[in-house]
Amino acid sequence: MPLVEHALKRMYFQLDTHRKTGVTVIKLIHGYGSSGTGGKIRIAVRKELAAMKAAGKIRDYVIGEEFSMFSPVTRQILVACAQVRGDRDLERHNNGITVVWL
């Protein structure tokens, strides 16, 4: 589990750092797991983001598979940060990423 713990520590650091500098949206690249079916880091990151959202520490997040113009959260993120419209993973259903709205 040390790899997962290390990944979560890095995530917390990056979210805090970017929030302090005024960034509103950040894309986390956590991968999807070496077999394409596992992904302990992906699962842990998304579980922690759900807890952070429930605690009011982040506004919202959208998983890569749902990072699409058809997603209400994605549309809200685009209003908050128009630059996201040019993100290469938009509409690609990439399960190796998660977009976080700080």
For each predicted feature, which ranges?
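Long, charged, low-complexity intrinsically disordered regions
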Residues: 1-102
